[in-house]
Structures are given as structure tokens and as C-alpha cells.
């Protein structure tokens, strides 16, 4: 516990908060090219084959990103837009691919939460 005199002389040391998505380098999104498109199994209580892609970003950093939604059209050299945001049951995955931009198609037959999956408004 510092004395008041020490606080006047030195002040408090600020805590440095580290970024949650360091590969984006402070940008909201980054463009990248898919290097590998595979599946992964989630952590303990859950069971599935979650779709993931290894992406080389435009700044040269390679990250693993989650492909949200049902079904996708991504292949090895697809150009994608990556945003931050982790997937709770997939360890080490801190990025998501944005659907409906660049080479990524939106989710088909999506009625609710369409903007999150790049789906167009359905015809009446």
C-alpha cells in the first residue's frame, strides 16, 4: 500500500488490457484467403462437427475462423471477410467468417436473424 507522498510522486501504474482479437490489429474486419476448410469437435458436454477454416489474413497472419450457419460454399482458395468473436465450445477459435460477403454465400432458406447470416429477404 503506497503512501500519499508516493502516489503524488509516482502515481498508479495503468493495467495494460490485451486485445481479444490480436490478428485483426485493431480493425473491425480483415480480408483473408482460406488455406484449409475442415471440421472440429466441440468441448465436453457438446457433440457436433463444427465447420472451421484456416485463413491467411491480408496482413500475413494465419488464424482459425468459425463458419457460422447451416451449410457453406467455402473451398481452399475462397476469399473471406473475418471478424472477431470467439466460439465458446471450440477452444482456440477467436474469429468468425462473415456470411454473404466476398466469396462466402449467405445461408439458404433463413427466415430469422437474416442479417447475421447474409440471407436475403424471402419472397412473399
From Swiss-Prot:
GO terms for molecular function: rRNA binding; structural constituent of ribosome; tRNA binding. It comes from the Bacteria. Residues 112-124 have a biased composition (Basic residues). Residues 104-124 are annotated as: Disordered. The modification 3-methylthioaspartic acid is found at residue 89. GO terms for cellular component: small ribosomal subunit. The keyword DNA-binding does not apply. One of its GO terms (biological process) is translation. With S4 and S5 plays an important role in translational accuracy. Interacts with and stabilizes bases of the 16S rRNA that are involved in tRNA selection in the A site and with the mRNA backbone. Located at the interface of the 30S and 50S subunits, it traverses the body of the 30S subunit contacting proteins on the other side and probably holding the rRNA structure together. The combined cluster of proteins S8, S12 and S17 appears to hold together the shoulder and platform of the 30S subunit. Belongs to the universal ribosomal protein uS12 family. Part of the 30S ribosomal subunit. Contacts proteins S8 and S17. May interact with IF1 in the 30S initiation complex. This is Small ribosomal subunit protein uS12. It comes from Pseudothermotoga lettingae (strain ATCC BAA-301 / DSM 14385 / NBRC 107922 / TMO) (Thermotoga lettingae).
